[in-house]
């Protein structure tokens, strides 16, 4: 069995794989709670990807489970990494592209990862990872309007889209954040289709189902794309 751990800005996500088959997933704000959900498994290999520093105590907990490998932007993958500043590339972005490569090998694809940040990652049909873009995610947009102004309240995220015309401050903030992000995603997809008419679009990340609902179109969503990508890389090296 393989254990895949993805340390994000907000939560830690984990997946258990038997070869290439995903057997179980979990997510938690603490490593202890996450690992407790995998107690019944014995692991041969562990792959870790992180965008945050992992405390030594947490690493000790992981190492008790098995031999660990860290995934970084310089790790060998089936993709050719053409990013200009490889050392600054977030491991989650490359891992998501590797996950999409399992689905679209031989075709161009754009991964839209809707999490704390909204990340766009493009790979051409030759398997060259070229990069993309990063912008604030939905919760970050809502929080920023509160933290960078004196009087705007903090409006919590919910799954219901705001009306086009907000008739009070809270609904106006929701409209700007929610419909603004939705319009951004629609616009970026259109630009990529102009750049490459054959590009495949795949969504992942915690807010992906929310975007799918707002786009009202037949889009492909895989919430476990990063975990699958990391597992494929681990198997690639075994």
Placement of each model-derived feature along the sequence:
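Nucleotide/phosphate-binding catalytic cleft detector across ATP-hydrolyzing
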Residues: 1-11, 15, 21-109, 126-238
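Catalytic metal- and UDP-sugar-binding loop of GT-A-like glycosyltransferases, i.e.
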Residues: 112
